[in-house]
């Protein structure tokens, strides 16, 4: 055990200021801000701030009764950097800068580089010493430096620190306490990382942290900076990575913050057509200004280095890339070349990623980019933006639209399930089901699903199984793993009492098992970004809303994935098999353990010689209604495949689970209830589960389907050509989603309160 961070000393040489003005001071926080020092045998605090337009600046606080001018600062460079040493000041003393503008007005500003701040509604900065924390995560750090960032498992649990779980009376846990509560849950559920909504200091709870005023201070709502260090340290000790939401695109207009810092535009673009997001009520950074570049890049590295954060999810990248983002005609000006691209922001993002990943190639730089901007995750040297991951917003929009559609009409929307594969390997994608999808009237993930109570759970299980098998890393917002009915509310904890109900506990158990299965099977994560890890089997059975594909690992092991997006039992469904031999069902979302009907394959399924879907052999299986199935593909071809399958159609069983190899820990509740109803849930007409018989093959006749209220006609299975070549070509030309050609509007409109 040893402190891994040396005490941050202010640097009094001219070099930090020179680098700062060149845009190359990547550790500006070591120079600017408030630092404990001893000068001529006297301890105190040295303050430094950048304010190029100020006529005068003084430091005010309790120590001088907030009297302007009593402790004036002086320019150290004769230009824009101000400094003052005040003896006798100590840690936790509250202060602000009193700035005299060129117009003669006085404005009181929090320190842009403060390490700690008062808790809202107060907004003063606090002197804080970051040194002295003892880290215990050396083993984690060493392992991360050796890890394969791109080709490793990543299954992220996105969460809001103040509303995941609360104490009695609705009080939040502090950072360290939160870790103690969170770690057992994350370990039990099998997630690899947690991703925190912004924890940089912010004044307005309703912004969820996306309106930042303190880019170097963890919000004091949940404790001190060292409490946050303890959170990260404990997570790492438990083998859990920590990703943090970081917001360089814009900042709020709070008078104590960065806005018009010295009476004029400093951090924001001075051009009103470029410097403001009117729809959001926030200001846009001046990305072309060197001092702003030093500020933002220093902030990014600060969290990665001083707090050992494993990666940053960079918010609202699309708003940075386009000058016309959410702006009407006449509200924006083209760049010097006449285009709508923000050339300064593009250059900044490349510089940011080159700097961060140049120092720390094992860290994550994840772009929330909602358009089809090309080469987001390609190196800047090749013309890319230099991120190593990007959220797949096209997949998210298409799939949520598809899953909300009544199953009776899904056949006409089949392209929404398959379209993402045209571009799945064009970027290093993360599949996000994030906080943005469960707020503002959109409904929780469970309540997006069509049908009645049981139907919603079956749909959600099917979707989760499909999502886990789709190429790309995974992200799920808190509460969706157990079927939160209500939309997320940042003021309240999740509805944990829902786990007293069978369906919610069974859904949670399914997600737990699915997460464990994911980690144990490299085929689901080792080759996420190449056609080498994926192959279509059935891409176009739109009439029956069925797809099937293979996922592969580097050793050649394969998993066959079959998704039935209709509440129809399909007996005798025949599909091509890549290898002859025995196929073993290893996960089934319809397993009774997970709340399904229990239609499972208790016996292995053998191939027969009938060619299908471009393969020399095929298998015939039973697809439970609304389900995702995983089969283990034989690793070696047998000399002689069985001509006919000797297996009988699968039978319902509630006793024996087919889950093999994954951790299966059913949630046990002594007072579990039968059913939980959603609040104000509109009645939805139930689509009855029916049986449909696939076209009978010449060598095998499955059992006749029983009569039910509905009799959808099954389409004959037709051989299809492999689509990999077509998809590779299409990937070069098609955008990420057919409906998304313009930047998507964000719904976050909350304005920051006045000071």
Stretch-by-stretch model annotation:
Residues 636-755:
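Intrinsically disordered, polybasic Lys/Arg-rich low-complexity tracts
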Residues 51-53, 77, 88, 160-165, ...:
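Short, flexible loop/turn elements at secondary-structure junctions
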Residues 183, 232, 300-304, 353, ...:
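Non-transmembrane alpha-helical segments in soluble domains
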Residues 1-152, 176-186, 454-457, 468-476, ...:
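Carbohydrate-interacting/catalytic domains
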Residues 118, 138-153, 160-341, 605:
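Substrate-binding/active-site clefts of carbohydrate-active enzymes
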Residues 308-310, 325-490, 498, 519-575, ...:
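Conserved alpha/beta catalytic core and glycan-binding cleft of carbohydrate-active enzymes
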Residues 74, 205-209, 253-260, 377-378, ...:
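Short glycine-biased active-site loop of nucleotidyltransferases that positions the nucleotide triphosphate
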């Amino acid at each position: 055990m040893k402190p891994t961070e040396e005490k941050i000393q202010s640097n009094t040489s001219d070099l930090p200021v020179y680098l700062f003005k060149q845009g190359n001071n990547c550790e500006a926080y070591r120079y600017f801000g408030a630092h404990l020092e001893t000068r001529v045998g006297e301890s105190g605090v040295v303050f430094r701030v950048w304010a190029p337009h100020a006529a005068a600046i003084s430091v005010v606080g309790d120590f001088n009764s907030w009297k302007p001018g009593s402790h004036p600062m002086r320019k150290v460079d004769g230009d824009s950097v101000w400094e003052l040493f005040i003896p006798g000041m100590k840690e936790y003393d509250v202060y602000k800068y009193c700035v005299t503008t060129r117009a003669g007005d006085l404005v009181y500003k929090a320190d842009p580089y403060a390490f700690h701040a008062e808790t809202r509604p107060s907004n003063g900065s606090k002197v804080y010493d970051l040194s002295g924390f003892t880290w215990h995560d050396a083993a984690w750090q060493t392992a991360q430096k050796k890890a394969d960032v791109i080709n490793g498992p990543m299954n992220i649990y996105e969460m809001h620190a103040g509303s995941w779980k609360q104490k009695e009376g609705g009080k939040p846990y502090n950072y360290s306490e939160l870790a103690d509560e969170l770690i057992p849950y994350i370990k039990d559920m099998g997630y690899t990382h947690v991703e925190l909504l912004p924890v940089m200091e912010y004044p307005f709870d309703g912004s969820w942290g996306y309106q930042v005023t303190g880019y170097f201070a963890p919000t004091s709502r949940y404790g001190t900076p060292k409490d946050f260090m303890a959170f990260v340290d404990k997570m790492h000790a438990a083998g859990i990575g920590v990703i943090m939401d970081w917001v360089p695109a814009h900042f709020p207009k709070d008078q104590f913050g960065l806005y018009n810092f010295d009476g004029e535009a400093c951090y924001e673009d001075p051009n009103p057509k470029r410097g403001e997001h009117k729809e959001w009520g926030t200001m846009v950074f001046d990305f072309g200004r060197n001092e702003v570049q030093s500020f933002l890049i220093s902030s990014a590295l600060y969290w990665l280095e001083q707090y050992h954060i494993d990666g940053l999810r960079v918010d609202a990248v699309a708003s940075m890339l386009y000058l016309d983002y959410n702006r009407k005609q006449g509200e924006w000006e083209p760049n010097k070349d006449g285009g709508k691209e923000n050339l300064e922001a593009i250059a900044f993002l490349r510089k940011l990623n080159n700097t961060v990943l140049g120092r720390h190639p094992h860290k994550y730089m994840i772009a929330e980019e909602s358009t089809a901007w090309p080469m987001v995750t390609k190196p800047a040297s090749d013309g890319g933006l230099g991120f190593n991951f990007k959220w797949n917003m096209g997949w998210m929009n298409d799939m949520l639209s598809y899953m909300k559609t009544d199953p009776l009409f899904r056949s006409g929307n089949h392209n929404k399930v398959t379209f993402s594969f045209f571009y799945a390997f064009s970027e290093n994608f993360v599949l996000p089901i994030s906080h943005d999808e469960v707020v503002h009237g959109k409904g929780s993930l469970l309540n997006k699903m069509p049908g009645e109570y049981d139907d919603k759970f079956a749909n959600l299980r099917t979707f989760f199984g499909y999502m886990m098998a789709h190429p790309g890393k995974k992200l799920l917002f808190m509460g969706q793993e157990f079927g939160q009915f209500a939309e997320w509310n940042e003021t309240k904890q999740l509805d944990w009492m829902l786990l007293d109900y069978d369906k919610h506990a069974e859904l949670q158990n399914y997600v737990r098992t699915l997460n464990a299965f994911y980690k144990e099977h490299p085929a689901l994560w080792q080759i996420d970004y190449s056609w080498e890890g994926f192959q279509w089997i059935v891409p176009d059975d739109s009439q029956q809303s069925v797809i099937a594909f293979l996922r592969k690992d580097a050793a050649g092991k394969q998993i066959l994935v079959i998704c039935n997006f209709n509440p129809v039992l399909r007996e005798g469904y025949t599909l091509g098999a890549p290898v002859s031999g025995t196929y073993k069902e290893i996960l089934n979302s319809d397993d009774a353990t997970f709340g399904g009907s229990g239609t499972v394959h208790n016996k292995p399924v053998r191939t027969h010689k009938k060619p299908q879907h471009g393969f020399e052999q095929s298998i015939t299986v039973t697809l439970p209604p609304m389900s995702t199935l995983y089969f283990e593909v034989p690793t070696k071809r047998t000399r002689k495949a069985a001509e006919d399958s000797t297996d009988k159609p699968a039978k319902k069983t509630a006793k024996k689970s087919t889950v093999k190899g994954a951790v299966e820990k059913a949630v046990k509740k002594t007072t579990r209830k039968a059913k939980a109803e959603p609040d104000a849930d509109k009645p939805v007409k139930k689509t009855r589960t029916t049986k449909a018989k696939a076209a009978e093959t010449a060598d095998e006749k499955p059992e006749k389907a029983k009569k039910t209220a509905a009799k959808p006609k099954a389409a004959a299975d037709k051989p299809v050509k492999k689509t990999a070549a077509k998809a590779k070509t299409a990937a070069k030309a098609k955008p990420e989603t057919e409906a998304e050609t313009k930047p998507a509007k964000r719904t976050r409109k909350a304005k920051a309160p006045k000071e």
